[in-house]
Amino acid sequence: PQRGDIVVINRYTDEPLIKRVIFMGGSFFKPGNVTPTAEFNWWFDPEAARIVVRTPFREQIMVGLDVCEKMPFSSDRYQAFLAGQRPEMKKLLESTYAGQQFAKDKAFSQYVWDVLAAAILIDPSLITEERTCAVDVNAEFGPSYGQALAYPDNGPQGSQKARIVMTIDQERFWNMLTAR
């Protein structure tokens, strides 16, 4: 959820050293994961999400379900990831909820939403397809509460342009996670 981002925005919005802001959240061109129209983070607090995406940063990159749900973290990937870890890290990973699920069910998979956003922060060249749109969040209570909105041209007053990530170089991403 975006509420903590508001504290940072109120303090640092005009900071000239902020080159870009990368958000994990929203689902612009596909169904949501908690309602038919909303992704969890923006549905949980759409008013905060709206303030955040309307902040006039020089560059905004949105990492939503549009890209995140194209690349599940499968059992095979998890095992490959474990193989490259030190014993103490391997033990820690195996003790997590995901580690326990992978041990019980070889068909288990999950998405790595925040990890993907962090990887793009480290290396924006991972992005291979994006759409630049004015973005907004529906903060009106109702069936589409928390819906991520994208406008190819101009959006409502106050909305800002953002790069919505659609596809990344998956091979480079997974290699980044397993590299030592």
Where would I find each of the regions flagged by the language model?
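Active-site histidine-anchored catalytic micro-motif
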Residues: 1-70, 75
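Conformational coupling and interaction surfaces
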Residues: 40-47, 60-180
